[in-house]
Regions:
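An active-site-proximal structural segment forming one wall of the substrate-binding cleft
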Residues: 1-2, 7-12, 16-53, 77-84, ...
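Hydrophobic/aromatic-rich, well-ordered segments within soluble, folded domains that form packed cores
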Residues: 47-57, 61, 232-239
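Catalytic-core regions of glycoside hydrolase
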Residues: 51-192
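Catalytic cores of secreted or luminal carbohydrate-active enzymes
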Residues: 170-223
């Protein structure tokens, strides 16, 4: 964890099967706050990073020392670290483990549930969704991301039995949990190593379904293309059929391709796809020049990733080419004349 040696040598607690620093020691908090400052200077806004979970405190960096609850940093010390994150990161979202109006709820933070489907939905205060609601943080998802990790003991049962919807051992209804929390991302290491699953191909299909239920699901619900004085007037509407918005600025591009599929022009619009809430829509329009050569052309839409090698946003419409270009119109320049 990068804790200085002198903090190990002068710690309060003895060795067991692991080394645990004294989280109440202000010297440790000083070190962690200094780390966060430099961490933000180097990585805030780095397009390779989607979100950062705050970590640093408690077992596995999950902000608890269960079952030794008296060993956790005080609320004041926790607030110092959250304040350091809030100061150091303006662009990259930071996520906290627990929703709490006395600490994490005071800052521009998202949240992550690392016992997803196990302690996500319930009436008592131990459940993640209940904590969001009781601390009046259940609308945070509209501006800041929610995510987590499927409870480790639930991962193989879900993949084996394909009971993500009905609930498996240790698991609540996964899709209900996603819908209620508006989760955008989820960790599930078993979906990658597949160790212990009965049917790997079925497990992969199940994992794909779990993944596709998260976050935004953008579809082009309306489109209109008109020719006027050598220009193409293009308008379209994007609807979010998912459970959460997009949290980064991504911009749609209008692509004109010839009959052989070669791209002859690509125009990125200045209007972002960010922030379209579930079941809401946003309209876009632009005007571009007709291609110079005669022939048949296709008008398509997609949203390129600003990161080199990154995957674009692909609209969920079926009429796509190359798996990413959503076709909205075709035209023949001879007929336009």
């Amino acid at each position: 964890m990068g804790v200085k040696k002198m903090l190990y040598d002068d710690r309060l607690f003895a060795d067991y099967d692991c080394i645990v620093p004294d989280y109440k020691d202000d010297r440790l908090i000083d070190v962690l706050c200094d780390f966060v400052k430099h961490f933000g200077e180097k990585y805030d806004g780095d397009i390779r990073i989607a979100y950062i979970t705050a970590g640093l405190l408690g077992q596995w960096g999950e902000w608890h020392t269960y079952p030794f609850n008296d060993r956790m940093a005080s609320e004041e010390q926790q607030n110092r670290i959250f304040a350091a994150y809030d100061e150091a990161f303006d662009k990259t979202p930071i996520l906290a483990r627990y929703p709490d109006s006395k600490t994490s709820g005071n800052y521009d933070l998202g949240f992550h549930d690392d016992a997803f489907t196990h302690e996500t939905i319930g009436k008592s205060g131990v459940y993640f969704l209940t904590k969001l609601q009781k601390n009046k943080l259940d609308s945070v998802w509209k501006e800041r991301p929610i995510g987590g990790e499927i409870y480790p003991q639930a991962q193989i049962p879900i993949l084996n039995e394909n009971k993500a919807k009905k609930g498996a051992d240790y698991a609540q209804d996964y899709y209900k949990c996603v819908k209620k929390t508006h989760a955008s991302w989820m960790m599930m290491w078993s979906a990658f190593d597949l160790e212990g699953v009965n049917d790997k191909e079925q497990a992969k299909k199940t994992a794909d379904g779990l993944s596709s239920s998260l976050g935004y699901d953008y579809t082009v619900s309306k489109s209109f293309v008109k020719h006027k004085k050598g220009k193409l007037q293009i308008s379209f509407t994007v609807k979010n059929k998912g459970v959460a918005p997009l949290y980064y600025d991504m911009f749609p591009s209008v692509v004109i391709s010839d009959k052989d599929g070669n791209i002859v022009s690509e125009t990125m619009l200045a209007y972002t796809l960010k922030g379209i809430l579930p079941n809401k829509s946003r309209s876009f329009s632009t005007e571009i020049n007709l291609p110079e050569g005669d022939g048949t052309y296709t008008v398509s839409l997609y949203s390129p990733n600003p990161m080199q090698g990154g995957k674009p946003i692909v609209f969920s419409n079926r009429n796509k080419t190359d798996g990413k270009y959503c076709i909205i119109a075709e035209f023949d320049t001879d007929k336009l004349k």
